[in-house]
Amino acid sequence: MKETPLSNCERRFLLRAIEEKKRLDGRQTYDYRNIRISFGTDYGCCIVELGKTRVLGQVSCELVSPKLNRATEGILFFNLELSQMAAPAFEPGRQSDLLVKLNRLLERCLRNSKCIDTESLCVVAGEKVWQIRVDLHLLNHDGNIIDAASIAAIVALCHFRRPDVSVQGEEVTLYTPEERDPVPLSIHHMPICVSFAFFQQGTYLLVDPNEREERVMDGLLVIAMNKHREICTIQSSGGIMLLKDQVFRCSKIAGVKVAEITELIQKALENDQRVRKEGGKFGFAESIANQRITAFKMEKAPIDTSNIEEKAEEIIAEAEPPPEVVSKPVLWTPGTAQIGEGIENSWGDLEDSEKEEEEEGGIDETVILDDTKMDTGEVSDIGSQGAPIVLSDSEEEEMIILEPEKSPKKIRAQTSANQKAPSKSQGKRRKKKRTAN
């Protein structure tokens, strides 16, 4: 599968950002991505993460016959594999030009620089020597493979332990880790590669380019150096012409970066060795326990927020006031009106109206009480007319009369009827007077 090319818009955007000294991940020109080193349960196994670029390093050893021209030296072998798991553009089982170039650069950086004492790998001169094999697997590709691979290779070699051997006459005895402690390799120094990407024919420079920056770069300069500022190898690719001052400046930057990376490697090795001695938990499972599959991880980028408030005030002062926007337009036509439009708010007058109603209610109660205070004779007359209400001097009957709401009205109606209609005795007396006359 071929690599997806960048569009013209993306290319122009990246180049313009580089001209303005800006990078997509928020780094500065000479900033490296975060480096994370984790070790496996076995010696010589590690994973190095350079940003999102991941490389797995594994070191193994075996006893073999030495080379004819170097009978007293061991053998170092490096192998870098680019699988489709890292990027779809990599083809499995095929030696691409990129893979060949990376393997050669690793051999020059680690084997030709004599960072490992190969004579200490000899067991019997001319017969048995140790062959150290370093296998590097690219797990994820996000640019700058050579830097991540060189760090993974040197970390795996420093972490590796070979079995102990003893020679008695012609007999060679190989001891297991349970019988004797494994022996570490003799390492003189740690060469580390630092990559520099050039743009616009060497006008602009970036350290540790990522995958998108590598697509638009014009040339690449790789400098392998140790913490003693000794250059192990240097390689330029891309066909650009570099000035002597540019190479010197890159070498100074590489010296600073290599010193920082070497210190990080030594701290990681010391921490792993201390955990193993104390009997604590170690391995890949412990190193990635916090990064669960279902969890999201967000990398924070530093942002300068010193002048944000001042700029915000300036923008607000310069901005024009927004026009008034009617959320719901109303169309006024003849014969239409809106309830509550133009009327004063009367919510505060509710208390006064409630007080007035209470006062009126008190007046009605006094009137009802006055009406109930009637003569006993009149009440007896009402009862003689067939009314069901009978009053007496007892307090219980008076309370029964006052409790219902309609009883006072009935009393009023009956009293008014008695006043208008004369009694039967009065009617008989009037008839007698008329007959006498």
UniProtKB/Swiss-Prot annotation:
Biased composition regions of type Polar residues, renumbered to the chain: 413-425
Annotated compartments: Cytoplasm; Nucleus, Nucleolus; Nucleus; Nucleus, Nucleoplasm
Annotated positions of the N6-acetyllysine modification: K297
GO CC annotation, single: cytoplasm
Keywords: Acetylation, Cytoplasm, Exosome, Isopeptide bond, Nucleus, Phosphoprotein, RNA-binding, rRNA processing, Ubl conjugation
GO biological process terms, semicolon-separated: exonucleolytic trimming to generate mature 3'-end of 5.8S rRNA from tricistronic rRNA transcript (SSU-rRNA, 5.8S rRNA, LSU-rRNA); mRNA catabolic process; nuclear mRNA surveillance; nuclear polyadenylation-dependent rRNA catabolic process; nuclear-transcribed mRNA catabolic process; positive regulation of cell growth; positive regulation of transcription by RNA polymerase II; RNA catabolic process
Chain's role: Non-catalytic component of the RNA exosome complex which has 3'->5' exoribonuclease activity and participates in a multitude of cellular RNA processing and degradation events. In the nucleus, the RNA exosome complex is involved in proper maturation of stable RNA species such as rRNA, snRNA and snoRNA, in the elimination of RNA processing by-products and non-coding 'pervasive' transcripts, such as antisense RNA species and promoter-upstream transcripts (PROMPTs), and of mRNAs with processing defects, thereby limiting or excluding their export to the cytoplasm.
Family: Belongs to the RNase PH family.
Description of how the protein assembles with itself and partners: Component of the RNA exosome core complex (Exo-9), composed of EXOSC1, EXOSC2, EXOSC3, EXOSC4, EXOSC5, EXOSC6, EXOSC7, EXOSC8 and EXOSC9; within the complex interacts with EXOSC3, EXOSC4, EXOSC5 and DIS3. The catalytically inactive RNA exosome core complex (Exo-9) associates with the catalytic subunit EXOSC10/RRP6. Exo-9 may associate with DIS3 to form the nucleolar exosome complex, or DIS3L to form the cytoplasmic exosome complex.
Name of the molecule in the record: Exosome complex component RRP45
